Amino acid sequence: MEFSERRNINRGYRKLKVWQDAIGYYALTCEVFRAFPVVLQRLAAQQFASVDSIHRNIAEGYCRRSLKEYLQFLNFGLSSAGESVSGLHAYRNANQVSEVDFERLDAAAWKLENGLKRLIESLQSKQREGGWQESFVIRESNTAYHVAETEGRPSQRRPPVRGRKK
């Protein structure tokens, strides 16, 4: 998967294999459910929503930077994957999805669910060991921001107050 040059630490989730798998699962879901007849569009919309929320929860959790919140959102994504697979079983049993499409979607969901479970287990291990950095670390010089320093501290000069007559 290729990305634009617009990169920053907040967009790092795009490198995660589980996020890429979730995007692939969504694309495959669109391919299969786009062909649903009009009378089943509500069901198709529910399937789109459950699958779409997986990659969104992975990204949102990643961007939160708190390990507790990250794990919470990964678990939301895992729950959405379960919801989508439950729908697949119902659609297959009602002959609304072919066996071939069911197998393709179920295989993609299975791979994604296992990836999410491994990521969650890995992060829980880091949580137990205390090996998680919850803050953004900026390694730049203050001169890039034109910060005036007085005695080793940033200037305490206040901006002029507007609107008062002297």
Protein language model regions, located:
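Amphipathic alpha-helical assembly/interaction segments
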Residues: M1-K166
